[in-house]
C-alpha cells in the first residue's frame, strides 16, 4: 500500500478540529492506555513543532500525533494499513493520512505487509522517532519514586534505554532509525523527547495512571 500525497513545504493542507479528532479517536479506541498514548504523542508533537520552528503549525502537528494509532486497537494486524479508511471516513485529508501511515515505515505488521509510506517532512520524521520513545520515557518515569519525568536526568533515561528487557515493547531499532532519518544523534532525540515530556507532564497528569496501564507500559 502506498499513499503518494506529500505535505508541501510542511504546510498544513487540511485541518480537522481537535474536538472532532478526539471524537474520531474514541470511535475506534476505548482502552485508556491507547487514549493516554495518543494524548501524550499529541502533546509531544506540539512541543516539537514549537521547538523546531513550526509554531504556527503546532495544532496540526498535534492532530497528527493524536490520530497516529487510530487503527491499532481494533486492527492491530493491519496497523497503518486500515488507518486511511478510518481517517477518510472521518473526513481527514490525505496529508494527515500520509503522516499517520508514515510512522510505520519499514515495519512489517501482523498481516505480513511492510509499510512503505516513507516519512518525508520533518513532522513525519519526528513522529516516527518520538512515538516509541514516549512510551519508554513514560515507563521509566513510572519506575521512579516520584512517578515523574521532571526529576529524571538524561543518564537515567539512557540507562533504561540500554536495558533491553526494560519496556521491551518500545523498539530501540525504530527509535534509532528515527534519529537517523532526522539526521540527529540518538542523544539529541533522547534529550529533546525527555524535555518535551517534562514540559507537558502537568497537562497529561502522568502521575495519575491506573495500575493496569502501568503494567502495560513496563511490559
Task: Name these PLM-found stretches.
Residues 207-219:
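Single conserved hydrophobic/aromatic residue that forms the stacking wall/gate
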Residues 5-75:
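Acidic/His-rich, divalent-metal-binding segments that scaffold phosphate/diphosphate chemistry
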Residues 149-191:
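Divalent-cation-assisted or electrostatically stabilized phosphate/pyrophosphate-binding catalytic cores
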Residues 22, 26, 39-42, 46, ...:
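Predominant activation on well-ordered alpha-helical scaffold segments within soluble catalytic domains
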Residues 54-164:
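Divalent metal-dependent catalytic cores for phosphoryl transfer on phosphate-bearing substrates
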Residues 1-2:
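Methionine residue identity
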Residues 43-51, 173, 185-200:
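Active-site hotspot residues in diverse enzymes, especially metal/ion-binding acidic/histidine motifs
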Residues 15-19, 35-39, 77, 151, ...:
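Electropositive phosphate-/nucleotide-binding environments in soluble metabolic enzymes
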Amino acid at each position: 500500500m502506498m499513499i503518494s500525497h506529500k505535505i508541501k513545504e510542511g504546510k498544513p493542507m487540511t485541518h480537522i478540529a481537535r474536538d472532532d479528532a478526539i471524537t474520531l479517536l474514541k470511535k475506534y479506541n476505548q482502552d485508556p492506555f491507547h487514549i493516554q498514548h495518543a494524548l501524550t504523542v499529541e502533546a509531544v508533537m506540539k512541543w516539537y513543532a514549537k521547538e523546531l520552528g513550526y509554531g504556527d503549525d503546532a495544532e496540526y502537528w498535534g492532530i497528527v500525533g493524536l490520530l497516529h494509532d487510530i487503527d491499532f486497537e481494533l486492527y492491530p494486524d493491519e496497523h497503518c494499513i486500515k488507518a486511511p479508511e478510518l481517517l477518510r471516513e472521518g473526513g481527514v485529508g490525505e496529508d494527515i493520512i500520509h503522516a499517520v501511515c508514515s510512522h510505520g515505515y519499514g515495519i512489517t505488521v501482523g498481516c505480513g505487509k511492510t509499510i512503505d509510506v516513507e516519512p518525508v517532512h520533518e513532522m513525519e520524521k519526528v513522529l516516527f522517532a518520538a512515538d516509541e520513545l514516549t512510551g519508554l520515557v513514560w515507563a521509566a518515569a513510572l519506575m521512579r519514586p516520584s512517578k515523574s519525568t521532571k526529576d529524571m536526568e538524561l543518564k537515567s533515561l539512557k540507562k533504561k534505554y540500554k536495558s533491553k528487557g526494560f519496556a521491551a515493547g518500545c523498539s530501540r531499532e525504530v527509535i534509532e532509525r528515527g534519529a537517523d532519518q532526522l539526521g540527529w544523534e540518538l542523544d539529541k532525540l533522547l534529550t529533546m523527547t525527555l524535555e518535551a515530556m517534562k514540559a507537558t507532564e502537568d497537562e497529561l497528569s502522568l502521575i495519575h495512571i491506573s495500575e493496569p496501564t502501568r503494567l502495560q507500559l513496563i511490559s
